[in-house]
Amino acid sequence: MLYDGSSRIGGLAHILLPSEGLSLDSDNRAKFPSTAIPMLIEEMRKRGAWGRPMAKIVGGASMFASLLPSGGINMGERNVEATKRVLRLAEIPLVASDTGGEHGRSVYFHVSDGRVVVKSLKMGERVL
């Protein structure tokens, strides 16, 4: 999630893969951090965002780890690292995160104040 507190404008992307090279169909720019983050910034600016955005990351779980061979690819972890790399390159501060583990999460993004509420059966509720 990106949020500009000055204008109270934000957006989020559901990152599915760390790079376009891992997809058979790379037409959906919102699936990859290298294209989703610039797209979010562009859309926020179109809607009047003028301040410096900040970021919060949620997700990156390895929900099916028990089905993977030991040492197998952890796509969630790779998505988180790729997202952090793109944020660093764009000089967008990462101010909070709730990532990893083996549990799913529900995310509620309150654009009015930038709060992100993360809920999971395993970990309960957390506000970022």
PLM segments and residue spans:
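Conserved mixed alpha/beta catalytic, RNA-binding, or beta-rich assembly cores of soluble enzyme
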Residues: 1-47
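Acidic, glycine-rich active-site loops and adjacent beta-strand->loop/helix elements
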Residues: 16-21, 59-63, 100-101
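Short, well-ordered secondary-structure micro-motifs
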Residues: 23, 66-68, 107
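Conserved active-site and cofactor/substrate-binding residues in soluble primary-metabolism enzymes
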Residues: 31-35, 39, 52, 74-78, ...
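Residues at alpha-helix termini
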Residues: 47-48, 90
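Short glycine-rich phosphate-binding loop at a beta-alpha junction
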Residues: 52-59
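Phosphate/ribose-phosphate-bearing ligand recognition and processing surfaces
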Residues: 62-77
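Divalent-metal-activated hydrolytic enzyme cores
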Residues: 76-128
